[in-house]
Amino acid sequence: VFTLGSYGYYPMGSGKLGGEAEPTEYPVMTVKTSQKTLLRAVTKDEYTGRSWRDTSSGRRYLYVNPRWRSLRQEVFLENMPAETVLKASNLLDQKAISIQMQNSAASTVFTPAYLRSLTTYGSMVPYFNEASELFITRDLISGDRYTVYAPVIEGGDASLGALVNAAPKNDPYYAQIAAKYTALPGHLEERVYQDMRSMIADAATPYEQACAILRHLQRYYRYTLSPVTPPENQDFVTYFLYVGKEGYCTYFASAMTVLCRMAGLPARYVEGFLAQPDSSGFAY
């Protein structure tokens, strides 16, 4: 299974957050895409204070098996949003994104968040799990290629807020989702909750609240590959917010997820890659 540790981002080992990152420089994949695309690898739902864990079922289901079609549609939100919402914006138009591996990697298949369909080539047999992660039955090797079809959405897009507002306000799955994806450990300090409330004070909708948290992190915290590592007895996100105030992707993603959950916004911690194409339409 994919881990950022294979690419130099878990120097503390065993998925423990923190430490000085040493990113690898070899190419992982080539991506043909018309715009900046976030490619998700793994999602995690439980925050311990020092790491993230995936507590979803370890069972995997054959992607093309009709028996699991309903589960696949639910996991990947294939039937969402409603047709009326789709017609309200072209933001959810499907794009073809072609990926070819340039080096060996774990069995995890990289895809955008809202996967609609997947075409694999050669001996790649895709499976999925209930965390909406995709895998094949072996490790990826150089030359493996596949095409995904999905809308390409970026948080903060001006038209995304309008799309969210057009969506139905009642979701039969919301209570179940919220219970799992707003859970936090009891040791988090009250001052973090107070500061979160200040961040979102002027935000009128859940989407605006998430954007307000994002802007706060972008404005007041610095990106670096050489941050100070929190002491063993301190919460990782709290230390980042109040002491270190600098870090790399795992720092910002952890803080964003925890703060969103504090605000009552269901959120998962996600790891993967950002594909940013050049003028030829390829990202490396």
For the regions a protein language model found, what residue spans apply to each?
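Helix-boundary/low-complexity linker signature
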Residues: 1-284
